[in-house]
Design a protein with these regions (language model features):
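Sec-dependent N-terminal signal peptides
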Residues: 4-13
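Short acidic-glycine-tyrosine-enriched beta hairpin
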Residues: 102-117, 235-255
């Protein structure tokens, strides 16, 4: 007993400290369009950005995956069906065929749709050009009652959604409110259980959405075009950490993390961000 205790005391404290890993407050990934020559005909490839397939997936609470399907000409992705999971598809590039239950629906660049639990769905490419689709998946806690799914998906194009300012944010950024909860009425699609907002932000030169935080939600930003500075966490000043960001930069923010964006302050500088936010369950209700 004494020898064992002595051996433990002789172990350097640094060795013991190395056993643990501190969870990140936010995550950054950078994505780029795939090389068309690297995509085999007839295939569907999934690239994880956050969540499933990413090494830091354990810190996500409600988001199960955020990534991109690359579907080659005449390719088709495997069908999915989740009992307690909802998804959003957003077509980044190309023309798609959405399989929803036993029906098919066309989708084109900048189309988006909501996919409820308990409905089989998949995406296919019937064209001769490459297809890229963002896929976002969210876990629905057992305490939430799930109703009957819509017989057909609602598909909306980004261009059909009006820009507007949002209370609490400066007029230097305009929003397109794409998707929200079933209890809402302001979004183009209001059918979600845990997704509180899926939205597009358009910043004028020098514009910002003013850094803020959400105490009970996690959020993802994807810079679609333009350049600026992402705000992530408190930084060295304890207020906001600012990091250069350009098209293809994606950020995941844990609950209560400071989040925001500053566009470049020069003539003609525009920036657009696609963002999604989902509420998290209380700590004692995690599934």
């Amino acid at each position: 007993m004494f020898k064992t205790l002595l051996l433990f005391l002789l172990i350097p404290s640094g060795v013991l400290a190395q056993e643990g890993k501190v969870d990140a407050t936010w995550l950054h990934r950078s994505i780029s369009p795939p090389n068309k020559n690297d995509v085999q005909a007839g295939t569907c490839h999934y690239k994880p950005i956050f969540g499933e397939g990413d090494p830091d997936n354990r810190i996500l609470r409600t988001v199960t995956r955020f990534g991109e399907f690359t579907v080659a000409a005449n390719g088709k992705c495997q069908a999915a069906l989740y009992d307690r999971q909802e998804e959003i598809y957003f077509v980044v590039e190309g023309n798609a065929v959405l399989h929803y239950a036993d029906q098919t629906y066309p989708m084109r660049t900048n189309d988006f749709t909501y996919l409820p639990p308990a409905v089989s769905h998949s995406i296919a490419n019937a064209s001769g050009q490459m297809l890229r689709v963002l896929v976002m998946s969210f876990k629905i806690p057992a305490r939430i009652s799930i109703g009957a799914a819509a017989p057909a998906p609602k598909i909306v194009n980004l261009d059909a959604v009006k820009k507007q300012t949002v209370e609490g944010h400066p007029a230097s950024v305009q929003y397109k409110l794409l998707l929200g909860p079933r209890t809402a009425t302001r979004d183009a699609i209001d059918q979600a259980y845990v997704v509180t907002s899926f939205f597009w932000m358009d910043f004028v030169p020098g514009g910002t959405n003013f850094p803020h935080h959400h105490e009970a939600a996690e959020e993802i930003y994807l810079v679609m075009d333009g350049r600026g500075e992402i705000v992530a966490g408190g930084g060295t000043d304890g207020i906001e950490g600012r990091y250069p960001a350009a098209a293809g930069d994606a950020y995941y923010f844990r609950p209560n993390c400071t989040v925001g964006f500053y566009n470049q302050n020069k003539p003609g500088a525009t920036a657009n961000i696609l963002a999604v936010r989902a509420r998290i369950p209380p700590p004692d209700e995690d599934d």
